[in-house]
A protein has these predicted regions:
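Alpha-helical recognition segments enriched in aromatics with Gly/Pro capping
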Residues: 1-55, 267
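Active-site-proximal acidic segments at structured loop/helix or strand boundaries
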Residues: 52, 56-144
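Short coil-to-beta-strand transition motifs
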Residues: 151-159, 259-263
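C-terminal, non-catalytic macromolecule-binding modules
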Residues: 156-227, 231
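Beta-rich accessory regions
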Residues: 163-172, 180, 261, 268-275, ...
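A conserved acidic, glycine/proline-rich C-terminal tail/linker
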Residues: 238-256
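Conserved small/polar residues in nucleotide/adenosyl-binding loops
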Residues: 285-290
Length: 294
């Protein structure tokens, strides 16, 4: 059985390891059992995959997205949906009380009410995703921009009032005001089209997040005519300054979560030690899918 866009041949994997392209036989970009486990694939998802494709001695190929489908189906009703900011920029609510902390009731999994709720701290200073703000937005951009009102997920409506920039013109802080009558998503007085997620700046925790992609170039195929591999230079992106909900401080190796609007992630079982938290992407949403999850 041949899985598209991955390296399966033992001698090719050995070369990737020897050349330092991957960090071992359990590198999450590979499809060994140890690699799949480290990336977050469950035994149930692998069994589902085998059941779907069938076991055959005949040579055949299966698209990698089939494996991703199986892990999504397995996890979607099992794991908590948490807020994590992968590329943070500070958001200050200028009219919010300075030292106030509110705890918002948030469903652990909107599709599985039996998983209950949790309390998420909300403060004057938050972090949001940098891509959720634009100074000069295109048409049909419904997230944050000057003068626009958006919903902070499970919290309040806020309206952007301005930005701070450094000497190079980079945005360092976004300012907004909030409407205290719009708390918790139950407000029906007016509608907004954009919803973005957030994490408290003072209560959030820091973590490293690793985003994995196909180790080979999807357009060119796995192998060249001479037998060499078309390595994707962007198969791993390491994000060092991510800010996550404080509850994730209790996460343990191989715990799995859905990061709202980003995808499914697993605590690395090799590099997460003590106070160092490392999350590996198991399944990333496309930008369209992320907007659908908002």
């Amino acid at each position: 059985l041949y899985l598209t866009n991955v390296v399966t041949g033992k001698r090719y994997i050995k070369k990737l390891v020897e050349d330092g392209v991957v960090d071992g036989w359990d590198d999450p970009r590979l499809v060994s059992i140890a690699a799949l486990r480290r990336r977050g694939f469950t035994p149930e998802s692998i069994k589902m995959f085998v059941d779907l494709v069938g076991v055959t001695k005949a040579q055949g190929s299966v698209e990698y997205p089939m494996l991703e489908y199986c892990i999504r189906e397995d996890l979607k009703l099992k794991v908590k949906r948490m807020m994590a900011i992968l590329d943070p920029v500070k958001l200050v609510i200028d009219n919010y009380p300075e030292d106030q902390v509110e705890y918002m009731d948030v469903a652990n999994n909107q599709e599985n009410p039996e998983m209950g709720t949790r309390k998420v701290p909300f403060t004057k200073e938050l972090y949001i995703e940098r891509e959720d703000f634009m100074e000069e937005p295109p048409k049909k951009y419904f997230r944050m921009f000057p003068g626009n009102e958006v919903r902070l997920m499970n919290a309040y409506y806020v309206t952007c009032t301005g930005v701070d920039k450094d000497e190079n013109g980079n945005i360092t802080c976004i300012h907004c005001t909030y409407d205290p009558e719009t708390k918790g998503g139950n407000f029906t007085g007016r509608k907004v089209k954009g919803t973005i997620h957030w994490v408290s700046a003072s209560r959030g925790i820091n973590a490293e997040v690793r985003l994995y992609d196909n180790i080979v170039d999807e357009e060119k195929g796995v192998y060249n005519e001479d037998g060499s591999m078309n390595i994707n230079p962007n198969s791993l992106t390491i994000l060092k300054n991510c800010v996550l909900e404080p509850e994730l401080a209790n996460a343990r190796p191989e715990d799995r979560f859905q990061f709202v609007r980003n995808g499914y992630f697993c605590v690395d079982n090799k590099d997460s030690k003590g106070n160092v938290l490392v999350f590996n992407s198991c399944l990333l949403y496309t930008s369209d899918a992320a907007d659908d999850k908002a």
